[in-house]
Amino acid sequence: MAAERLDPWGAVEIKDYDRLLRTFGIRPFSEVLPLLRKAGMEPSFLMRRGIIFGHRDFDKILEAKARGERVAVLTGFMPSGKFHFGHKLTVDQLIYLQKNGFKVFVAIADAEAFAVRRIGREEAVRIAVEEYIANMIALGLDPKDTEFYFQTNRGTPYFRLIQLFSGKVTAAEMEAIYGELTPAKMMASLTQAADILHVQLDEYGGYRHVVVPVGADQDPHLRLTRDLADRMAGVVELERPASTYHKLQPGLDGRKMSSSRPDSTIFLTDPPEVARNKLFRALTGGRATAEEQRRLGGVPEVCSVYHMDLYHLMPDDGEVKHIYTSCRLGKILCGECKQIAWEKLERFLAEHQSRLEKAKTIAWKLVEPPRF
């Protein structure tokens, strides 16, 4: 974390999550686990395993829910590439919260895709609908209780917030949070703040208790948004949003997972033979020889195949613990471990892709694409 900053647009690799908690004032998620049950919610395996490791004010959201007040969750996706397992990690959290009574809002960051990534408008719309929205529906997000929207189509009150926010923060303050910024990134940051806060307006449902689940690298946007909510007092009353933070799933090459490096991730639309080849070439924590691994054991902490099990393929805690222990004790070799993961991945992809074409048809009916 150079100069104690996180870059939400860059290839951030975070090694020390405890330091991140200390540096940026994020609270450990473990402290809200008892409150989940009071709110009638069983912790998900992502929560139990510490993959969701931190929060800001999520305890207040749970207390509001326990009082019977309306709660919502909002996230956004920039349509700049194919939908991969890193994206699925966020959607799994949306599905969990939706099943527990949260209204879901999903922003399609088409303005940011154009300004920051230079994605053509028509291409951004196609990617948004056929890759992101369709995959979310196929994963199990209920479209009847989800509001999808394009940033550039959202309406006057939303854009009014962006304009007013621009008068509540200086360029120097934004650079202290983000580092050097282009005009496009400044605009994208203010727009993301509007995404997070606008659902509190009556025109968009008046949801005062909102949580935003993000990867740890996205925290700068939350810090800016919380400051802006405070500074809008006297203009429009906005509550600080809550947030939860998940660890970034390593790519198959050990670096940050990215659509721009196709071999670093498995896309949810990959044909079986492509997905299998990627998985079997993935970085592992194995030793140089089978004999050495049996003697010394493997290192699952740096194994991208184990991370696929941990984050996605093995919701049963006992099963994933067995894989971890067997690797550590040298009782299982990498080839066998990959085969176990592949059998689960193959089944998941087959079932998911069988739902995808129908989901695409539904997805096009859910949103109004921007005219230009």
Curated annotation (Swiss-Prot):
Keywords assigned by UniProt? Answer: Aminoacyl-tRNA synthetase, ATP-binding, Cytoplasm, Ligase, Nucleotide-binding, Protein biosynthesis
Q: Which InterPro entries match?
A: aa-tRNA-synth_Ic (IPR002305), Rossmann-like_a/b/a_fold (IPR014729), Trp-tRNA-ligase (IPR002306), Tryptophan-tRNA-ligase_arc (IPR020653)
Residues of the region (Disordered) are: 247-268
Q: Where is this motif: 'KMSKS' region?
A: 256-260
Annotated GO molecular function terms are: ATP binding; tryptophan-tRNA ligase activity
Q: Which Gene3D superfamilies match?
A: HUPs (3.40.50.620), Tyrosyl-Transfer RNA Synthetase (1.10.240.10)
Enzyme Commission number(s) from the entry:
6.1.1.2
| UniProt record, GO biological process | tryptophanyl-tRNA aminoacylation
- Annotated membrane-spanning segments are none
* Superkingdom to which the source organism belongs: Archaea
GO cellular component terms, alphabetically, are: cytoplasm
Q: Which residues lie in Polar residues bias regions?
A: 257-267
Q: Which reaction does it catalyse?
A: tRNA(Trp) + L-tryptophan + ATP = L-tryptophyl-tRNA(Trp) + AMP + diphosphate + H(+)
PANTHER family (UniProt xref): TRYPTOPHAN--TRNA LIGASE, TRYPTOPHANYL-TRNA SYNTHETASE
The entry sums up its family as follows: Belongs to the class-I aminoacyl-tRNA synthetase family.
What name goes with this protein? Tryptophan--tRNA ligase
The organism's taxonomic lineage, starting at the top: Archaea, Thermoproteota, Thermoprotei, Desulfurococcales, Desulfurococcaceae
* Gene expressing this chain: trpS
